[in-house]
Amino acid sequence: GFAAALQAAGLHALRFTFPYIEAGRRMPGPAAHALLTWRAVTAAARQRGNGPVVACGKSYGGRMASMAAAEEPGLDVAGLAYLGYPLHPPGKPEKPRIEHLPAVAQPQLFVEGTNDPFVQPLAQLEEAVASCQSARIAWIDGGGHSFEVKGRKQAPAEIGASLAPLVAEFVRGIA
């Protein structure tokens, strides 16, 4: 999967599960809890001393990392990579979740599927990324929110492994 492919590329990956998931809940609860989790995880990663720390999160995890980075004090990371950033709830582009993104000082990589309902219309994400200090998008042609492509049968681990080189290149570019 994704973490194994990062490790094969010479990067260290520290995986975690948010407490609400550990508790068996479907809904995340207060964002403050997720922000505290990100702070604890990045502190643990820094203690390992394996080079710069880059926060990488899927969907909600990425959005929470971006919110933690935008706060004062920001998240102590060299950069942030988002896999399927949830720009807005599906079908509700009038409710964007972007107001904090320009406050993120670190480089940001948005890995997004062109068929992801969380980023339609695509121009809305492009505008949000243009408002950021240092950010870019890596589009996955035909990819949905979990990067699945209609008509192409791929296991989640295979999809994750295919995304890792994009993130590895980003990390090497900021390290």
Tell what function each PLM region has:
Residues 1-53, 147-155:
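Serine-hydrolase catalytic machinery in alpha/beta-hydrolase-like enzymes
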Residues 115-119, 145-146:
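Acidic catalytic loop of the alpha/beta-hydrolase fold
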